[in-house]
Amino acid sequence: MATEYALRMGDGKRVFLTKEKIMAEIEAGTANAADLGDIPALNDNEMDKLAEILMMPGKTVSVEQGMEIPVTHDIGTIRLDGDQGNSGVGIPSSRLVGCMMHERAFGADTMELGHIDYSFKPVKPVVSNECQAMEVCQQNMIIPLFYGAMPNMGLYYTPDGPFENPGDLMKLFKIDKAKESMEHAAEHLTRDTVWVMQKLFASGADGVNFDTTGAAGDGDMYGTLYAIQALRKEFPDMYIEAGMAGEMVLGMHGELEYDGVRLAGSWPHEQAPLIAKAGANVFGPVCNTNTSKTSAWNLARAVTFIKAAVEASPIPCHVNMGMGVGGIPMLETPPIDAVTRASKAMVEIAGVDGIOIGVGDPMGMPISHIMASGMTGIRAAGDLVARMEFSKNMRIGEAKEYVAKKLGVDKMDLVDEHVMRELREELDIGIITSVPGAAKGIAAKMNIEKLLDIKINSCNLFRKQIA
């Protein structure tokens, strides 16, 4: 009897497949992506590599040593303190505690602060509260800390917002009015997002994470692109990450363009240059998981799309890898075996510069991804590499080289806890364990500024406060 390997379906259910069946699923998945996106399918060596990863006997797998990448986040601390029947585990804790847990306990390379409703529009009435939370977090933390939220243009339509719902108008065949409503909503999305981030950046935020860009279609992406453009013009040093909602931008409007390119129907490799043109530092491409297909099919398809996006992108790519995207099953508690295999494949085959850790419980998401692929933050040098990707748009190889040179170590040492523990204490750039007298928070970041020859926003704010 042929050997069968334990894989997953797109909904997380375990399934057993032979090597021949796995290869057939991989071929079908990559062919599907190649056909839809008009991009190259994976070659024989890449398909063999993917099959090898999927058939590895261990429950968890990880990238080869030296291939680790920094991680960013969607939903921030909500995966800890949130309790809405999805992936939040309902631990009563402050957002400061949640952010510091990610930095000190999970080994995150970056982190983000976010409102419980996690959209820009609901932040407006409570922006002062968000600014205070950001200031307190920045005073205590070392890793880059973003403000994260969804553009979520749907909130601008009735009954939640001021503009008529385009879906209702389309049902009445009022197509022009529907388009007009989307255009107005996009303008308000841009305005609100810029206003919120003006306040947060003035409070020390390292930058912004636009999560699920394009969720309401091309109007949503249109408004977000112009928000990025405006923020980049006003704040040249702001870290900006733009992650997508889906693999293809839905043409709800159908005629909106950015830089002369129609947004509707664009795939990850076509979205990347637009995100870069607008002024983002990092692009977060997405590939949706099909719950009725195997993990072999889903992962092959996702790696094919993301590999093409990485090659087409002028800026670093942090693939979105929460539940239901990036070849990961659609399950609130994502299976660790599936998560770590997807993480490894994205790094070693697609060549991503980082991973945006998305929705899922703490064990299934940040812990699994960081164990499989992450640089472990201030346990080593993950925060430093992440800062170079965002401050200078460096791809992963260049960022590692730059940081290694500044530290006077080999690139392999950047993830070596033994080397970096001693070096971080010697340079006083922040360490993960509590040592009396060692630089923490702003003090550590000021030393990082000197080391990497960059400016950090929270340090600039502190200097203004004591001037």
UniProtKB/Swiss-Prot annotation:
GO terms for molecular function: dimethylamine methyltransferase activity. Pfam families: Dimeth_Pyl. Pathway: One-carbon metabolism; methanogenesis from dimethylamine. One of its GO terms (biological process) is methanogenesis. It catalyses: Co(I)-[dimethylamine-specific corrinoid protein] + dimethylamine + H(+) = methyl-Co(III)-[dimethylamine-specific corrinoid protein] + methylamine. Keywords: Methanogenesis, Methyltransferase, Pyrrolysine, Transferase. Its EC number is 2.1.1.249. InterPro entries: Dimeth_MeTrfase_MtbB. The keyword Membrane does not apply. It is an enzyme of class 2 (transferase). Catalyzes the transfer of a methyl group from dimethylamine to the corrinoid cofactor of MtbC. Belongs to the dimethylamine methyltransferase family. This is Dimethylamine methyltransferase MtbB2. It comes from Methanosarcina barkeri (strain Fusaro / DSM 804). The lineage of its organism: Archaea, Methanobacteriati, Methanobacteriota, Stenosarchaea group, Methanomicrobia. The gene is mtbB2.
